[in-house]
A protein has these predicted regions:
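Active-site cores enriched in adjacent His and Asp/Glu residues with nearby glycine-rich loops
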Residues: 1, 86-87, 133-178
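A composition/biophysics-driven feature that prefers long, compositionally simple stretches
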Residues: 1-135
Length: 178
């Protein structure tokens, strides 16, 4: 799946009930990650130009609205994750005003509900991640004590987390562990 440190910019998956595959809507800088880390065909990755970023009143969703209109989807019901981080009221207004003939609905955490169902492969990776996390916590209890420099303790913890297990390599975390 798409995995990038780009959640703070406008991006979305566009899923049409009759489309063979979803579309991935991302900024130009993040398109490479979408091409590499998803199974989507290049034409299913919709890239918006950097000129849509911080160029008020232009907004990336202006381009998204154009795409929806080009595909003749502008008179359909459109579900939005209204309680999604970084999906602002301004984003909502851009879509609602740009698609006045559509019915805009809150799909109420639909993505999270779909993500609840895990494949056997996902469960295997989650168990491996839990093992690595447990190793990291054990190392934290060993490394942290009065008089030990914070950087030295963190170095040992990070080493453990990134080293992983003999079967599964670790990785850096998406945010700094606190």
């Amino acid at each position: 799946g798409y995995d990038a440190w780009s959640f703070y910019y406008a991006q979305c998956a566009i899923v049409h009930v009759n489309a063979e595959e979803p579309l991935c809507f991302v900024r130009a800088q993040d398109a490479g990650g979408a091409y590499i880390k998803t199974y989507l065909k290049h034409e299913d990755v919709i890239v918006y130009d950097e000129n849509y970023i911080h160029k008020w009143p232009r907004h990336p969703y202006d381009y998204l609205v154009e795409i929806i209109k080009e595909r003749k989807w502008d008179k359909l019901s459109i579900g939005l994750e209204m309680d999604s981080h970084y999906f602002t009221a301004y984003c909502y207004e851009k879509i609602k005003q740009g698609l006045p003939n559509s019915r805009v609905l809150d799909c109420e955490r639909l993505v999270n509900w779909v993500r609840v169902v895990k494949s056997d492969a996902e469960i295997k990776f989650m168990k491996a991640a839990a093992q690595i996390t447990e190793l990291g916590m054990k190392k934290a209890f060993e490394a942290i004590s009065p008089g030990v420099r914070q950087c030295d303790a963190v170095s040992e913890i990070y080493t453990t987390l990134i080293k992983g297990t003999p079967e599964f390599g670790g990785d850096y975390s998406s945010i700094v562990p606190m």
